[in-house]
UniProtKB/Swiss-Prot annotation:
GO terms for biological process: proteolysis. The gene is CBP3. It is an enzyme of class 3 (hydrolase). Disulfide bonds join C126-C366, C294-C309, C332-C337. Monomer. This is Serine carboxypeptidase 3. Induction: By gibberellic acid (GA). Inhibited by abscisic acid (ABA). GO terms for molecular function: serine-type carboxypeptidase activity. Substrate binds at C407. It comes from Oryza sativa subsp. japonica. One of its GO terms (cellular component) is vacuole. Its EC number is 3.4.16.5. The active site is at S216, D404, H461.
C-alpha cells in the first residue's frame, strides 16, 4: 500500500512537471472521468445520447444460465430472407444479479459447416449492431428504413454471432448496477459462459472451427477472451470450443507502444509539424511511467495513466481540428464523424423491437456508463497473453486500415513486431508481400507461423465498412488457412516498410 502511494505521488510530480512545461492546465474537478467520457468516448467509437439502455419493459423473462432465442424476420427485409437462419436472443448471465446479454446469430448463406465467427465491437460500450448494419453484417439500412443485402457480409462464408457486451451495451442490460464490468476478467468470463450455453443450444455448430473477431477496444477484449476459451479447453471445462484463431482490426492492445506511435504517425501523415511533434512528445515519458504503475498498482494508477496518456492524443486533435481521426482523409461531419443515425431510428421502431424480443428497451449505440466503468482497464497491456496462444498454435491476425489515426497501423505494427515469442526473430525478418484481391493490391501482408499482420490500403478505422470486399476475402483466407499461400503466385515480393 505504501509503495502504491509513493508511486502515485511520483506520478503526480512527473505529470505536474510535464504540464508546466507545456502550459497545460489539468482538470481539477473530481468528476474528470465523466467529463472525459463525453469528450473521449469518440476516441474509439461513438458519442452516445444516453448512459445506457433503459426501459426493459416486457422483455421475456429467462432463468439464470439459460438462453432464450427466437427466429427473426426483420421488418423491411428483402425477399428470400425466409430461407436463412436469423436469430436474436438473450442469455441470462449466471453469477450476476440480473444481467442479460443480447446477441444476433446469422447462419451462413453458404453451408452449415462454415466456421463460427463471433464479432465484438469496441468502445468500450459500443453495440455490435453498428457492425451488423454498417460493416460486415447481412444488411445495410437505407434512409427509408428498408434493408438491402450486403453482398460482402461475413455471413456469406461463416455462421456469425454479434454480441452486445459488456453488460449495459446495446440491448444488453441489468437492473442492478453491481453487474457492471470493470475489467477483462469479468468480460471474458461472461463471453465464455455465453459460448458454453450457445453451443449447447446449437450442437450443429459445436464442432465447427471457431474464430474471434472485432475491432477497436476489442483489442483488449479479444486476447483475454481467447485466453479464457483456450484455458477452458485445456482444463476440459464444459463443451470444447474449437478455437482456431482470432483477428483484431485497428485495435488498442498495447497502450505503451501505441500511444508512443501517435506523434510519429501524425508527423508521417503531415497532420502536425516537427515543432508540434517535439512539443507533444514531452508527454510520452510521463505516459510510459504512468502505464508501468498501472501494471503494478491497480485502479488509481490506471486512471492516472488514462488521464496522462490521453493528453498526447488530445494535443494532436487540437491541431488537426475537424479531421476525422478514424480516417484522416476525411473531415469529421457532426458529433459522430460518421452518420449512423439510421441505426437508432431503425431500433426505435416498435415492430423491430417486437421482432427481436427486446420489449420497450431503448437502444443506445454507445454507453457512457460502460465506458466509464472500463476506464481503469484502458491502459492495461493485453499483448502479454498472446504469446502463449501463438505457442499453442492459435492463429493470430492483426489488421489495420492505413488512414486511421486513433488505432493506427504504425502502433499496431510496432507492438506485433515487439512481441516476444519463439517465432519473433523469424517474423521480424520475414518479407512483406502484397495482399491481392481481384488482381489489385489491397494491402501489405507479413506472416510467419501462426502470426500475421496486414496493413489494409484505402481504409480507416472500420476496415469492413471502407473495404468490404477486401475484408471478406481477408476473413475467407484467414479462416481457411490460406492467408499466406494465396498471394505467393500472384505478385512478386516487395520491399518491407520499416517496423519501429
Amino acid at each position: 500500500m505504501a509503495t502504491a502511494r509513493v508511486s502515485l505521488i511520483l506520478l503526480v510530480v512527473v505529470l505536474a512537471a510535464s504540464a508546466c512545461a507545456e502550459g497545460l492546465r489539468l482538470p481539477r474537478d473530481a468528476k474528470f472521468p465523466a467529463a472525459q467520457a463525453e469528450r473521449l468516448i469518440r476516441s474509439l467509437n461513438l458519442l452516445p445520447k444516453e448512459a445506457g439502455p433503459t426501459g426493459a419493459g416486457d422483455v421475456p423473462s429467462v432463468a439464470p444460465g439459460e438462453l432464450l432465442e427466437r427466429r427473426v424476420t426483420l421488418p423491411g427485409l428483402p425477399q428470400g430472407v425466409g430461407d436463412l437462419g436469423h436469430h436474436a436472443g438473450y442469455y441470462r448471465l449466471p453469477n450476476t444479479h440480473d444481467a442479460r446479454m443480447f446477441y444476433f446469430l446469422f447462419e451462413s448463406r453458404g453451408k452449415k459447416e462454415d466456421p463460427v465467427v463471433i464479432w465484438l465491437t469496441g468502445g468500450p460500450g459500443c453495440s455490435s449492431e453498428l457492425a451488423v448494419f454498417y460493416e460486415n453484417g447481412p444488411f445495410t439500412i437505407s434512409n427509408n428504413m428498408s434493408l438491402a443485402w450486403n453482398k460482402f457480409g461475413w455471413d456469406t462464408i461463416s455462421n456469425i454471432i454479434f454480441v452486445d457486451q459488456p453488460t449495459g451495451t446495446g440491448f444488453s442490460y441489468s437492473s442492478d448496477d453491481r453487474d457492471t464490468r470493470h475489467d477483462e476478467t469479468g468480460v471474458s468470463n461472461d463471453l465464455y459462459s455465453f459460448l458454453q450455453v450457445f453451443f449447447k443450444k446449437h450442437p450443429e455448430f459445436a464442432k465447427n472451427d471457431f474464430f474471434i473477431t472485432g475491432e477497436s477496444y476489442a483489442g483488449h477484449y479479444i486476447p483475454a477472451f481467447a485466453s479464457r476459451v483456450h484455458q477452458g479447453n485445456k482444463a476440459n471445462e464444459g463443451i470444447h470450443i474449437n478455437l482456431k484463431g482470432f483477428a483484431i482490426g485497428n485495435g488498442l492492445t498495447d497502450p505503451a507502444i501505441q500511444y508512443k506511435a501517435y506523434t510519429d504517425y501524425a508527423l508521417d501523415m503531415n497532420l502536425i509539424k516537427k515543432s508540434d511533434y517535439d512539443r507533444i512528445n514531452k508527454f510520452i515519458p510521463p505516459c510510459e511511467f504512468a502505464i508501468k504503475l498501472c501494471g503494478t498498482n491497480g485502479k488509481a494508477s490506471c486512471m492516472a495513466a488514462y488521464m496522462v496518456c490521453n493528453s498526447i492524443f488530445s494535443s494532436i486533435m487540437k491541431l488537426v481540428g475537424t479531421k476525422n481521426y478514424y480516417d484522416v482523409r476525411k473531415e469529421c461531419e457532426g458529433k459522430l464523424c460518421y452518420d449512423f443515425s439510421n441505426l437508432e431510428k431503425f431500433f426505435g421502431d416498435k415492430a423491430v423491437k417486437e421482432a427481436i424480443g427486446v420489449g420497450d428497451l431503448e437502444f443506445v449505440s454507445c454507453s457512457t456508463t460502460v465506458y466509464q466503468a472500463m476506464l481503469t482497464d484502458w491502459m492495461r497491456n493485453l499483448e502479454v497473453g498472446i504469446p502463449a496462444l501463438l505457442e499453442d498454435g492459435i492463429n493470430v491476425l492483426i489488421y489495420a486500415g492505413e488512414y486511421d489515426l486513433i488505432c493506427n497501423w504504425l502502433g499496431n505494427s510496432r507492438w506485433v513486431h515487439s512481441m516476444e515469442w519463439s517465432g519473433q526473430k523469424d517474423f521480424v525478418s520475414s518479407h512483406e508481400s502484397p495482399f491481392v484481391v481481384d488482381g489489385a493490391e489491397a494491402g501489405v501482408l507479413k506472416s510467419h507461423g501462426p502470426l500475421s499482420f496486414l496493413k489494409v490500403h484505402n481504409a480507416g478505422h472500420m476496415v469492413p465498412m471502407d473495404q468490404p470486399k477486401a475484408s471478406l476475402e481477408m476473413l475467407r483466407r484467414f479462416t481457411q488457412g490460406k492467408l499466406k499461400e494465396e498471394w505467393l503466385a500472384e505478385l512478386p515480393e516487395q520491399p518491407m516498410y520499416a517496423a519501429m
